[in-house]
């Protein structure tokens, strides 16, 4: 959406309600009602739309939509998947989330699940690092979705 479309499309409502898995566990983004084309040569001002708790903080202040708003929402979704619930207040505990990836993995995991194997733990830590990098306060410090998908 961000890199393969011209002009780029910003979804503006990436959340656990707008992503479904198919039978092969491949994710599909739904609900493009709030999507917006990003025009490089004009203002990308936007009204505030999206699901509470997933909206990038800068959108509330600047009302300017960028691809990095979707990246932030994706970071929230990643942590929600790992934790088993929306990270909510957990996000406000850390001024710079990417510097706190040294958190104990068991503090982040869904407590309803069994302790994962070492291989799975390594993958979960990688996912946490990606999720935290997507939540950087400065939108320019967030990765692109193209980098996230690698």
Question: Predicted regions: what is each one?
Answer:
Residues 2-9:
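Protein kinase catalytic-loop region centered on the HRD/HxD motif
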Residues 22:
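Iron-sulfur cluster-binding cysteine motifs and their immediate structural context
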